[in-house]
Amino acid sequence: LDYTYLGNWKSRAGNANIEPELLTAWLRRRGVDEALITRALHQLDKAAGDSSKSLYDRNRAVYELLRYGVKVKPDVGENTVTVWLLDWASPLENDFALAEEVAVKAADPKAYDKRPDAVIYVNGIALGVLEFKRSTVSVSEGIRQNLDNQKASFIQPFFSTLQFVMAGNDTEGLRYGTIETPEKYYLRWKEEAATGEAPAWAAADNPLDRELMQLCAKARFLELIHDFVVFDAGIKKLCRHNQYFGVRAAQARIRRREGGILWHTQGSGKSLTMVWLTKWIREHCADARVLIITDRSELDEQIEKVFKGVSEDIHRTKSGADLVARLNDTTPWLLCSLIHKFGGKDEGDIEGYLDELKRALPADFRARGDLYVFVDECHRTQSGELHRAMKTILPSAMFIGFTGTPLLKDDKARSIEVFGSYIHTYKFDEAVKDGVVLDLRYEARDIDQYVSNPKKVDEWFAAKTAGLNDLAKAQLKQRWGTLQTVLSSQDRLEKIVEDILFDMATKPRLMDGRGNAMLVSSSIYQACKFFELFAKTELAGKCAIVTSYQPSPADIKGESSAEGLTERLRQYEIYRRMLADWFLEPEETAMCKVEKFETEVKKKFIDEPGQMKLLIVVDKLLTGFDAPSATYLYIDKQMRDHGLFQAICRVNRLD
């Protein structure tokens, strides 16, 4: 790596995350005035040592100074000067150094002092910390040591400048995270040598050496800090290897003005890949503007949420006319546009969207700036039509398609024809192997098979209770003794409800309140019928419907019937009753609070699964990066291809 070795600092006094002598010496060699050095160091020390702020806020303040330079005035009345603490443009011009056994005093006098195994200093600023373990000791021990060190009673202030927090051993290799990264989210770097190349790391004796050489090579280390760090709504995040190589590949395409497709599987961080690529475009392409197009309101909301979470203002266009007006102006630089509903049609009405765009086009229309168009979920059937029409309206724009689902044969041919070849791929099996997502277990259940066969009922009971002791089985048998009668007499939905309730009583994660489940129904009406059935069981108050439906008196106009409630009336009544019971208020006022209801039940489903065990859905919550994860997914709906893949990805996330 060619770092300078600073020595063993076990007995050295005053070890800190900012070593003033080293930083001052580097700045002097750069020709920075002494007064500016003093002021810049003061600002850096102040940001890093502000004990009134959380570690996250201190670290973010330091990162801003490293990334964008320290703004100082040489004297009163003089213009502001930027003092750069790192040379981003020429990485090899920085002083990379390593100290081992860096003894740091604990914040609490009663606590033990700590001694990180190795600290990476760049120009005297601690940017990386490493804990090494023997090959017989798990890397997890090193990760937990890092997490302990960040506790307020130990050496938390030392971490205010750190970007990489790492642990490793010779057999398992290196794991990396950043400040406050939970153990399960520590990452492993993965890289293959390009054809015909023989990098130095390829000859490394063990995975630890190889991954250190890949991750901590001078240029790579600074590039990762400069281009691939994000502070996302209270959580600092680093990129995974697939995000890094995906963005790098896209950068190369952009330089050549060639579009293409980024296919990164569900759950592998596609939204942040979009953020990092967008930020790079803005900094490296003159007059750059980025437009992100989606065809689902949930995706549109989520894209706005993720960009605002990383402090980037994004304008959500209200209509096709609004989009045209914004493109015809020089601001804003970042926009997202939903293919809106038109004439009562569903979301994703491409024809209506394009018609409105064309009607809104002034005679002299020309999109201002250098425009880059991202099309989310580009595998969908209509993306070709959209792309061709948008290309006519925006002839000089560059298009990049994003997808997280496997492209089937027809979709693949169409998507490649429309957007160009793959820029980068990261597939489901790779993500499972890397531990980014979990593999799935699938069980097909045919409820009707039990109706007339007592033997099947006994087999079903035996399979369900495998692993339970005799006492537990006896108690369940007593409770479910009438199961054969129940299954023989009830209609199909009631049988599904009984089946799920049995799981709630026998599956460990569902029994102990740590797990939850989603039931995918074929229609909103069927979802309401399911809810009505569950409301009569022990899941009452712990079950909710989340769909796109919003009860309105207009929905039931002309629906009265002498033969009883129509489907629409029944759906309307069940929804109103569910909302009224949740908010403990009259149905007339509660029915206007669907969005608030959805927010609250989602939060309870995630944070308190024991109190919200089951969500009944149709399409909503099955797609998008912030759709909640679940332990079990029950599908009572015909699903295939992309929709099925996105749905099952609700149950393979690490959280």
Regions found by a protein language model. Give the residues of each.
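Conserved RecA-like ASCE ATPase "motif II neighborhood" in helicase/translocase motors
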Residues: L334-V375, R380-A389, T599-V601, V617-D619
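Conserved helicase ATPase motor motifs in RecA-like P-loop NTPase domains
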Residues: Q266, H379-T381, I393-D410, G435
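Short, conserved "post-DEAD/DEAH" coupling segment immediately C-terminal to helicase motif II
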Residues: N149-A152, R380-M398, V651
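Interdomain helical connector at the RecA1-RecA2 junction of SF1/SF2 helicase-like NTPases
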Residues: A204-P207, K412-R514, F531-E538
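Conserved helicase motor
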Residues: S297, T317-A325, L338-G343, I524, ...
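Conserved C-terminal RecA-like helicase domain
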Residues: W480-L614
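A short beta-strand element within the Helicase C-terminal
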Residues: I616-V617, L622-Q638, L644-Q646
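ATP-dependent helicase/translocase motor core
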Residues: D2-R289, E298-I314, T330-W333, H340, ...
